[in-house]
């Protein structure tokens, strides 16, 4: 609105309302416009909050879907049966028998280095060879 339009509106308002009711009318109009503006601002902020909430929900849904698909891919790649087979294979490969029979004196003697007869000594000629310099090759 230009300044001329505002003056025309004021002149018409003075003629219709009169000079004594005009100040009250202007105050009432200002209160109404202020309330309307406040309601519009509240509506805008509510809409913006809803939009942010919807964006957050969509983002959370994306993360949930991504997590679910990754979880499903892992389940497809490694079923429980395969996991049990893998576990069994690992246990079989890493199993070491460290038990000794107390009746086996040869094992005890060989481990402790005691009472070795020439008959009980292992034949190392097949495993080790000695070169001219005295170096043992395995």
UniProtKB/Swiss-Prot annotation:
Q: What molecular function does GO assign, one term?
A: protein transmembrane transporter activity
UniProt keyword terms in alphabetical order = Cell inner membrane, Cell membrane, Membrane, Protein transport, Translocation, Transmembrane, Transmembrane helix, Transport
The reply to whether Transport figures as a keyword in the UniProt entry is yes
Q: Which InterPro entries match?
A: TatA/B/E, TatB
Show the stretches that span the lipid bilayer.
2-18
State any GO BP term from the record.
protein transport by the Tat complex
The topology of this chain with respect to the membrane is: Single-pass membrane protein
Tree of life domain = Bacteria
What HAMAP family does its record include? TatB
- Protein purpose: Part of the twin-arginine translocation (Tat) system that transports large folded proteins containing a characteristic twin-arginine motif in their signal peptide across membranes. Together with TatC, TatB is part of a receptor directly interacting with Tat signal peptides. TatB may form an oligomeric binding site that transiently accommodates folded Tat precursor proteins before their translocation.
**Oligomer and partners:** The Tat system comprises two distinct complexes: a TatABC complex, containing multiple copies of TatA, TatB and TatC subunits, and a separate TatA complex, containing only TatA subunits. Substrates initially bind to the TatABC complex, which probably triggers association of the separate TatA complex to form the active translocon.
Family note: Belongs to the TatB family.
Name recorded for this polypeptide: Sec-independent protein translocase protein TatB
Its taxonomic placement starts with: Bacteria, Pseudomonadati, Campylobacterota, Epsilonproteobacteria, Campylobacterales
């Amino acid at each position: 609105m230009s300044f001329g339009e505002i003056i025309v509106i004021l002149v018409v308002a003075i003629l219709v309302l009169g000079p004594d009711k005009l100040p009250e009318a202007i105050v009432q109009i200002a209160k109404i416009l202020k309330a309307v503006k406040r309601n519009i601002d509240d509506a805008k902020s509510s809409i913006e909050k809803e939009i942010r909430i919807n964006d957050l929900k969509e983002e959370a849904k994306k993360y949930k879907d991504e997590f679910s698909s990754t979880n499903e891919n892992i389940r497809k790649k490694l079923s429980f049966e395969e996991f049990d087979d893998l576990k069994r294979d690992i246990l079989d490969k890493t199993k070491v028998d460290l038990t000794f029979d107390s009746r086996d004196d040869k094992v005890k003697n060989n481990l402790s280095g005691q009472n070795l007869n020439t008959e009980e000594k292992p034949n190392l000629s097949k495993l080790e060879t000695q070169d001219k310099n005295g170096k043992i090759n395995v």
